[in-house]
A protein has these predicted regions:
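Conserved Class I S-adenosyl-L-methionine
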Residues: 188-189, 199, 206-283
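A short glycine-rich, Lys/Arg-flanked "PGG" loop and its adjoining helix->strand segment in the class I
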Residues: 134-149
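A short SAM/SAH-binding and catalytic strip from SAM-dependent methyltransferases
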Residues: 119-134
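A short acidic, Gly/Pro-enriched loop at the edge of an enzyme's catalytic core
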Residues: 110-120
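Class I SAM-dependent methyltransferase SAM/SAH-binding core
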Residues: 49, 55-110
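Class I SAM-dependent methyltransferase Rossmann-like catalytic core
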Residues: 7-29
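Conserved catalytic/acceptor-binding region of the Class I
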Residues: 151-219
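Conserved alpha-helix/loop element of class I SAM-dependent methyltransferases that forms part
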Residues: 27-46, 61
Length: 283
């Protein structure tokens, strides 16, 4: 997802400015996506789900990966994002790419996907925004065929987001973001809960790795953090969680960072690859 706002409950919004930020975000994290898909063996002719697809930048890459003999179903609840993705798919003649409007907070829609019909499911930055994880996890588990794979990119510890030397403005921003998401029912440390929940549904963890990064101010992942710092204070201010004084202090931290040697540290993003076991036949 990306999350919730004008269309429904997208906490980060689904307006054009946020869509553009998400496009830049996907470009920065794209190599990590491609590496995960490659390791999972996703390729031509497969049937894949993109759960919480947002504007569909990953969906387009998945559609190119499976080719004309495959199928990608991109699922989201933001109509503006789905319309944008549909237009992009038509422009690129990606007839294998389809969309479905579905609220992943609700226990519905499994029937539309069918039981055991999908080779893989991709889910990035979605679980952290959901009030109830059960509908999403149940949908993924039922939709995958035996031997199918689920790839998750979710945060295990969002408050590792930091800038060194430390500044009170950025520290306050991180705390207020976490408060804002929790006020909306989200969990910015959601990956900590996923192993137990998915194991209880019979899935097996095949692979995991940390995608946490630290970098200098001019590196892409530092620029991704700077991009977020330029847009999200408005959301916090609208919620009454951010004042002009807070912004002045954050601006001072950023100005110092850009003029001196500084280290940016991302939130602790985790990659997990899960498999739905094949049903063994008894002799």
């Amino acid at each position: 997802m990306t999350a919730s706002g004008e269309d429904s409950s997208y906490v980060l919004g689904s307006h054009e400015g946020e869509r553009d930020r998400l496009q830049r975000q996907h470009a920065i994290w794209r190599d990590d996506c491609l590496a995960a898909w490659q390791q999972a063996g996703w390729g031509a002719g497969q049937r894949l789900l993109d759960l919480g697809c947002g504007p569909g930048f990953a969906s387009l890459d998945l559609a190119a990966r499976v080719g004309p003999t495959g199928r990608v179903l991109a699922i989201d609840n933001a109509s503006a994002y789905l319309e944008h993705l549909q237009a992009q798919a038509r422009q690129s003649n990606l007839q294998q790419l389809h969309t479905l409007a579905l609220d992943l907070n609700q226990a519905s829609g499994v029937e539309a996907l069918g039981d055991g019909q999908w080779d893989g499911a991709w889910c990035r930055w979605v679980a952290m925004f959901l009030n109830d994880l059960n509908p999403l996890l149940d949908l993924m588990t039922r939709a995958l065929r035996p031997g199918g794979t689920l790839i998750l990119h979710e945060y295990g510890q969002w408050d590792t987001f930091a800038l060194y030397p430390r500044g009170a403005g950025l520290d306050r921003f991180v705390c207020r973001c976490i408060q804002h998401w929790r006020d909306h029912g989200g969990d910015p440390h959601v990956a900590q809960r996923l192993p137990a929940l998915l194991e209880a549904r019979g899935l097996r963890l095949k692979h995991c790795r940390s995608l946490m990064a630290c970098s200098t101010s001019d590196a892409p992942k530092a620029q991704w953090l700077q991009d977020f710092l330029g847009s999200y204070p408005d959301q916090l201010a609208a919620a009454g969680l951010w004042s002009p004084g807070d912004q002045e202090e954050l601006d001072a931290d950023l100005s110092h960072a850009m003029g001196h040697c500084s280290v940016w540290v991302t939130p602790a993003l985790m990659e997990m690859v899960w498999e739905k076991p094949c049903i063994s036949s008894k002799p």
